[in-house]
């Protein structure tokens, strides 16, 4: 369950958060100037799109700008063709909305178009809705061309601002590694529960973001190729150091303060060097017999391992051409066998069309946000959908409250575009601070911005129409209700179904750690383990948001939470071993592989059989005997035994659908 300071942590300052929020605010203010100066329609939507077009680094933002302009160009061309066919036929217009929506949402669930297909479905369906309400064909064409301008204008402003102010991907990678080293140094100076939580959050972030930034830096041809390779190695080394600090910090600070001071100095100097673009190849920790004699054997082993990692901190490996991975197909392997993909497309389309028919029959177009809400909040499982419903509801109410207050007390006093830009800047800064935070609350920031802009940007002149905010809020509330009922009553999919499959995956990842050769490869596997653990923790939290009818019982969730703690401990301990401990690694790998097979046979495979009988012809191989429990070292034996005992206690998780079947 989230700890008491969960929300406070999500809102507290983090490196780069304020800078990103300020850039979002500046782009919103400049976009507002242009739409008010040239009186283009839908100024609120133009400003709102800024939040979708920008990311913390320059490289990703520029790619998004180009991709969105190309995408909207292609979509408008397709919609113009479709509009010519269905504009005068309401029945065919509704049918085309349903067919296109179902098809695109199926692709959003079952294909490589997953990141954008749902957005395309929303744009196409809503555009066909607007086509039906237009009084003449020429108005349709002009409206669609203005829609292109609504995307191109903020994209152009974003491109200019990001090209000047946004940090390059290479700089983002440098800062991330330097901040990790600063965190390690601070943990050694002030070990405690707060620092342990910070370290755990940093470990869960893994190296994926750094790897992405370095890849973008390669595409940009920014920085020296040797520096990029050094930074890639430094990312792995700093991750291993972070995991080792969990064990090392309490022992070294109590037993050898001078050595701790020297290590902190070394780490801070390395952080400064990396920030200025001079990643060190090696860091020398002065270890002698006197220093090692002053600590316990456990701490001595950790210090020797630490010194080994520091000595190879940023040594760039020789350039090798990596093997090309096997090309993945366009569709997921279970695209046409798993009914959940079809159910998701049908449920989302049905909810959206119910809202469309409702506000059309009521002749109340102001609540069209209910139609949009169904596409935005609908996700693969009930837990994810309920979380997004809550974020949209909170953001909508908060943004509408801020916007209404501005309409009552601030907008009557505004006398220039510059004053309106200042108001937009402040509102966007508040929303941007939330949007620039954790993904657990970022979407709420988007909704705060949307509701606020709908209130304060109503056209080419100041307006005080409170019915706009009222109708949009009513639409969102109604859309939330329809989506909630649809996803909790019609083919509900509990996120609990994914938990055991992910647990099996992380057990396989853990079993692979001892088998790989080379510390670098083992560090990479450890980062994958922590990334999967972070996903599992999120799924366990989301499962508690689901309705009681499909929620997994608490008695099934608690042992799985204990299992995550054991896996986390064991993954950190495996990093202590190097290739010199080959026998211990082999034994640990065999034990873990056997445990993963047994967990698959007892817990995961029975669930897979009941959910998809055609795939149940061949189960996991359980013919192998349990490996002999030979000693693998003090840090491995204990967690391995705890892991085995906890796995033995687990039974297939019962969610709503399995309880109903029983």
Predicted regions span which residues?
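Alpha-helical transmembrane segments and their membrane-interface boundaries
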Residues: 1-156, 160-165, 279-448, 458-481, ...
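Long, hydrophobic alpha-helical segments that serve as membrane-spanning/inserting helices
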Residues: 1-25, 37, 58, 138-139, ...
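Conformationally flexible catalytic loops at phosphate/diphosphate-handling active centers
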Residues: 453
């Amino acid at each position: 369950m989230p700890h008491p300071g969960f929300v406070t942590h999500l809102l507290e300052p983090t490196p780069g958060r304020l800078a990103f929020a300020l850039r979002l605010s500046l782009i919103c203010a400049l976009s507002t100037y242009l739409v008010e100066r040239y009186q283009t329609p839908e100024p609120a939507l133009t400003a709102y799109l800024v939040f979708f077009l920008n990311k913390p680094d320059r490289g990703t933002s520029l790619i998004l700008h180009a991709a969105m302009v190309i995408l909207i160009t292609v979509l408008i061309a397709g919609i113009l063709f479709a509009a010519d066919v269905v504009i005068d036929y309401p029945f065919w217009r509704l049918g085309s909305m349903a067919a296109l929506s179902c098809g695109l949402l199926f692709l959003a669930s079952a294909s490589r178009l997953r990141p954008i297909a749902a957005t395309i479905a929303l744009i196409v369906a809503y555009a066909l809705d607007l086509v039906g309400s237009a009084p003449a064909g020429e108005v349709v064409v002009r409206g669609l061309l203005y829609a292109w301008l609504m995307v191109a204008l903020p994209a152009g402003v974003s491109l200019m601002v990001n090209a000047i102010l946004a940090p390059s991907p290479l700089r983002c990678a440098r800062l991330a590694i330097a901040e990790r080293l600063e965190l390690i140094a601070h943990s050694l100076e002030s070990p405690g529960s707060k620092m342990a939580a910070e370290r755990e959050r940093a470990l869960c972030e893994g190296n994926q973001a750094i790897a992405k930034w370095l890849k973008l830096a390669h595409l940009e041809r920014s920085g020296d190729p040797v520096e990029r390779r050094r930074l890639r190695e430094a990312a792995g080394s700093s991750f291993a150091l972070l995991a080792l600090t969990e064990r090392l910090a309490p022992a070294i600070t109590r037993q050898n303060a001078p050595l701790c001071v020297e290590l902190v100095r070394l780490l801070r100097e390395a952080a400064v060097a990396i920030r200025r673009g001079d990643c060190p190849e090696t860091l020398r920790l002065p270890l002698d017999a006197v220093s090692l004699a002053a600590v316990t054997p456990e701490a001595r082993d950790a210090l020797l391992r630490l010194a080994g990692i520091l000595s190879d901190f940023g040594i760039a490996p020789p350039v090798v051409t990596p093997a090309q991975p096997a090309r993945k197909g366009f569709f997921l392997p279970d695209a046409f066998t798993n009914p959940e993909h079809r159910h998701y497309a049908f449920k989302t389309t049905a909810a959206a069309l119910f809202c469309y028919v409702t506000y059309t029959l009521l002749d109340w177009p102001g609540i069209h946000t209910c139609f949009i809400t169904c596409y935005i909040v609908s996700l693969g499982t009930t837990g994810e959908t309920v979380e997004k419903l809550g974020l949209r509801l909170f953001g909508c109410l908060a943004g509408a409250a801020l916007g209404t207050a501005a309409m009552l007390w601030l907008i009557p006093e505004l006398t220039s575009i510059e004053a309106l830009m200042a108001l937009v800047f402040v509102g966007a800064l508040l929303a941007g601070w939330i949007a620039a935070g954790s993904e657990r609350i970022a979407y709420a920031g988007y909704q705060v911005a949307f509701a606020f802009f709908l209130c304060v940007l109503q056209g080419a002149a100041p307006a005080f129409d409170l019915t706009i905010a009222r109708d949009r809020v009513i639409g969102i509330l109604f859309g939330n209700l329809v989506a909630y009922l649809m996803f909790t009553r019609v083919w509900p999919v509990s996120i609990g179904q994914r938990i055991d499959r992910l647990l099996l995956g992380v057990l396989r990842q853990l079993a692979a750690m001892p088998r790989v050769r080379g510390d670098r490869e083992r560090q990479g596997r450890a980062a994958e383990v922590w990334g999967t653990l972070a996903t599992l923790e999120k799924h366990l939290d989301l499962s508690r948001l689901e309705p009681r009818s499909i929620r997994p019982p608490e008695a099934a969730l608690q042992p799985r939470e204990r299992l995550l703690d054991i896996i986390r401990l064991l993954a950190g301990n495996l990093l202590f071993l190097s290739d010199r401990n080959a026998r211990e690694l082999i034994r640990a790998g065999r034990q873990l592989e056997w445990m993963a097979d047994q967990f698959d046979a007892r817990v995961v495979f029975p669930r897979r059989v009941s959910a998809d009988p055609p795939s149940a012809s061949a189960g996991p191989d359980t013919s192998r005997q349990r490996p002999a429990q030979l000693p693998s070292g003090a840090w491995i034996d204990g967690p391995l035994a705890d892991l085995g005992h906890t796995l033995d206690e687990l039974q297939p998780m019962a969610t709503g659908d399995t309880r109903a079947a029983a």
